[in-house]
Amino acid sequence: MNSERAQIANPPTQTPVPQQQEIPLAMVHGQPVLQIPQDLYIPPDALEVILDAFEGPLDLLLYLIRRQNLNILDIPVAEITRQYVDYINVMQELRFELAAEYLVMAAILAEIKSRMLLPRPPDIENEEGEDPRAELVRRLQEYERFKQAAEDLDALPRMDRDNSAAHAFVPDQTTVRIPPPVNMKELLLALQDVLKRAELFSGHAIRREALSVRQRMGDILAHLEGGKFHPFTALFTAEEGKLGVLVTFLAILELAKEQLLDIVQEASLGPIYIKSLATHHTNGALQLSSDFDNSPSTHVPP
């Protein structure tokens, strides 16, 4: 009896159930602000800045759940609904049209809360029925997957945001390839080849025709009109014999000395090409002269 009276006099203390921590509206000087001060002035457009952080009702609901590290599969509907409605009330006070789409989610939360509070019929009390939160959990999980995928895509480098294309003006430049100069040894080898071919031709000369180096210089310039390269061997006529070949060769040397010819060779022992430079030096008649002739100078028309 004494022990029973002691128990009645000193009833056992019950362990208090920990309450869920309320999310503060803001932190001021390190102190949480749970309610909006009555004398706080909020500009009419301030809510637009707040709502920019949320992309819809599901985003706000997911924020409330993740903020408190709650299990999305076991949502405390009563507390989440209360916090959600608090946000809706703030929205309605400032800008009702912005909070309209959030009212639908508030109604869904209220319905789920009421379904969980209503007693179940005795006949299905022992049966495992569908959780009223199942559809909401499914929508939240699906939304979270899409949101994570969008954040992953946004983290990828983007042109004109993370990278900039480099633009540089490159002037149009035409590459002029200057052929290498011809070695005198190569030129003599080419002359030797022409002389060998001239020996293959034989004829009966009735009288010797005087060959002029100056005249041959004019013939060569006339043959090279147009400024194009011609083969070295194309300037020689084998039928003229060795004398004609030598006169042509001397005329080429005289023109090269006067810088009226451009003689090039692509590679060693390769073919030799000649181009006239007369049009680059003068637009009038050329005065040609040679130390090998005693006759008057030859004039070449332009």
Swiss-Prot record:
InterPro entries annotated for this entry?
Answer: ScpA, ScpA-like_C
Cellular localization per UniProt: Cytoplasm
- Work out whether the entry's keyword set contains rRNA-binding: no
Q: Which residues cross the membrane?
A: none
Pfam families from the UniProt entry: SMC_ScpA (PF02616)
Which of UniProt's keywords are assigned here? Cell cycle, Cell division, Chromosome partition, Cytoplasm
GO cellular-component terms in the record?
A: cytoplasm
Q: Which GO terms describe its biological process?
A: cell division; chromosome segregation; DNA replication
Which Gene3D superfamilies does the UniProt entry name for this protein?
6.10.250.2410, Structural maintenance of chromosome 1. Chain E (1.10.10.580)
Question: How the protein assembles, per its UniProt entry?
Answer: Component of a cohesin-like complex composed of ScpA, ScpB and the Smc homodimer, in which ScpA and ScpB bind to the head domain of Smc. The presence of the three proteins is required for the association of the complex with DNA.
Function of the protein: Participates in chromosomal partition during cell division. May act via the formation of a condensin-like complex containing Smc and ScpB that pull DNA away from mid-cell into both cell halves.
- What family does this belong to? Belongs to the ScpA family.
What protein is this chain from? Segregation and condensation protein A
Upper classification of the source organism reads:
Bacteria, Pseudomonadati, Pseudomonadota, Gammaproteobacteria, Lysobacterales
Name the gene for this chain: scpA
